[in-house]
Amino acid sequence: MRIEHDFIGQMEISDEVYYGIQTLRASENFFITNDKLCSYPVFIKSFAQVKKAATLANVQLGLIDEKLKIAICHACDLLIDGKYHDQFIVDMIQGGAGTSTNMNMNEVIANLALEYMGHQKGEYQFCHPNDHVNRSQSTNDAYPSALKIAIYERLSNLVAPMKALRDAFAQKAKEFAHVIKMGRTQLQDAVPMTLGQEFETYALMVDRDIEQVLDARNWVRELNLGGTAIGTGINSHPDYRSLIEKKIQEVTGRPFVMANNLIEATQSTGAYVQVSGVLKRIAVKLSKVCNDLRLLSSGPRAGLNEINLPKMQPGSSIMPGKVNPVIPEVVNQVCFAVIGNDLSVALAAEGGQLQLNVFEPVIAYKLFHSFVILGRAIETLTTKCVEGITANEKICHDYVFNSIGIVTALNPHIGYEKSAMIAKEALKSDRSIYDIALEKKILTKEQLDDIFKPENMLSPHAFKKHKD
């Protein structure tokens, strides 16, 4: 055991751990979610990148020596490479605007650096968590900057599964291009379309959301490093701000810049609201698609039954043979959670006061949670559902030609009133539109066959009105 102290008192710390007294206090104070910082390696990596960039700037400004720089950068590189992440034990939701997270990072880096230099953990006179690792920084600029860097990476990582889902829908659109089916509005028969057209819209929806995700990265490119406590830059070198911008770009390989006004950037959480809004948009639209898939596959004998979803597991403990659409159902629920997380982000952003928003920890937690579950849900939907969907072509075809909805195709030829009369009689007599129109000699068989050709009902085409 080793003894560490702060201005509150002292505590015993295990010699096996790399965190220190402030981390231990925080872990005891904030047992809230049991979801710890180590659950989000992208945040640990981005925070280590901030610390490394700051160290590189500090040594160039003569604020720390070369020996410390080498040791601290070595420690940061270990964390960036995914090592020692189990040392990050603070709860994601915490009081203090993220100070506990920042100090967990400072203490682990300091003790790794001490070990590298041949010292014992806790010998902070040689490398101090605050004086050296946190030099030229405050939690109030380090935490949000690390968070934005992590969000940038999570946005980038979300693109690949979204592209896979888009491509899966596009492939189904090609497979189903020849399958005519009934389009529906307000759950009522409308006009014909193809199943391929239906799936093509899903592919396009995802493609447009990919554009939104890529654009959202621009909202988190502005950092507030160098602002320190409230954005005025107190305790930082006059040249630190311009230098840290270059160093963070070098360390991350990403186009991050410092905000023009660091005071505004320190208190603003608008970028998080925008990013969360994009995730909510994806969730809302994805949930709607899952609603469609569940409805289109309903049955199999007393529902629409136009498509078949892959059979994943038995669906009932009491009804033999029942199979449920479990994959769309789980994605629906993920989407509900993401939408709820967005509300939490909005409330936390609104709750800020004066020069700092202390609620960034819950913003970070909800955003990371949304990224994780949404990414997994998209992958699950792609591989366990969409790729295995098949069409019930005969059912789709029969729905069209037994439907009242195809009467719409007669409108340009015989007018609305005659078409409505035919529809009314078809409903009353339970006969087809085609048979009634032919029986009443409103149109010839040749004319009806031409009008009801699938290709003439699926897209705009030239026509001429038939005489009475």
Swiss-Prot record:
<dbReference type="InterPro" id="IPR022761">
    <property type="entry name" value="Fumarate_lyase_N"/>
</dbReference>
<dbReference type="Pfam" id="PF00206">
    <property type="entry name" value="Lyase_1"/>
</dbReference>
<dbReference type="GO" id="GO:0008797">
    <property type="term" value="F:aspartate ammonia-lyase activity"/>
</dbReference>
<feature type="region of interest" description="SS loop">
    <location>
        <begin position="315"/>
        <end position="324"/>
    </location>
</feature>
<comment type="subunit">
    <text>Homotetramer.</text>
</comment>
<keyword id="KW-0456">Lyase</keyword>
<dbReference type="InterPro" id="IPR004708">
    <property type="entry name" value="ApsA"/>
</dbReference>
<dbReference type="InterPro" id="IPR000362">
    <property type="entry name" value="Fumarate_lyase_fam"/>
</dbReference>
<feature type="binding site">
    <location>
        <position position="139"/>
    </location>
    <ligand>
        <name>L-aspartate</name>
    </ligand>
</feature>
<dbReference type="GO" id="GO:0006099">
    <property type="term" value="P:tricarboxylic acid cycle"/>
</dbReference>
<dbReference type="InterPro" id="IPR024083">
    <property type="entry name" value="Fumarase/histidase_N"/>
</dbReference>
<comment type="function">
    <text>Catalyzes the reversible conversion of L-aspartate to fumarate and ammonia.</text>
</comment>
<protein>
    <recommendedName>
        <fullName>Aspartate ammonia-lyase</fullName>
        <ecNumber>4.3.1.1</ecNumber>
    </recommendedName>
</protein>
<feature type="active site" description="Proton acceptor">
    <location>
        <position position="316"/>
    </location>
</feature>
<feature type="binding site">
    <location>
        <position position="322"/>
    </location>
    <ligand>
        <name>L-aspartate</name>
    </ligand>
</feature>
<dbReference type="GO" id="GO:0006531">
    <property type="term" value="P:aspartate metabolic process"/>
</dbReference>
<feature type="binding site">
    <location>
        <position position="99"/>
    </location>
    <ligand>
        <name>L-aspartate</name>
    </ligand>
</feature>
<dbReference type="Pfam" id="PF10415">
    <property type="entry name" value="FumaraseC_C"/>
</dbReference>
<dbReference type="InterPro" id="IPR008948">
    <property type="entry name" value="L-Aspartase-like"/>
</dbReference>
<feature type="binding site">
    <location>
        <position position="317"/>
    </location>
    <ligand>
        <name>L-aspartate</name>
    </ligand>
</feature>
<feature type="binding site">
    <location>
        <position position="138"/>
    </location>
    <ligand>
        <name>L-aspartate</name>
    </ligand>
</feature>
<dbReference type="InterPro" id="IPR018951">
    <property type="entry name" value="Fumarase_C_C"/>
</dbReference>
<dbReference type="GO" id="GO:0005829">
    <property type="term" value="C:cytosol"/>
</dbReference>
<feature type="binding site">
    <location>
        <position position="140"/>
    </location>
    <ligand>
        <name>L-aspartate</name>
    </ligand>
</feature>
<dbReference type="InterPro" id="IPR020557">
    <property type="entry name" value="Fumarate_lyase_CS"/>
</dbReference>
<dbReference type="InterPro" id="IPR051546">
    <property type="entry name" value="Aspartate_Ammonia-Lyase"/>
</dbReference>
<feature type="binding site">
    <location>
        <position position="185"/>
    </location>
    <ligand>
        <name>L-aspartate</name>
    </ligand>
</feature>
<comment type="similarity">
    <text>Belongs to the class-II fumarase/aspartase family. Aspartase subfamily.</text>
</comment>
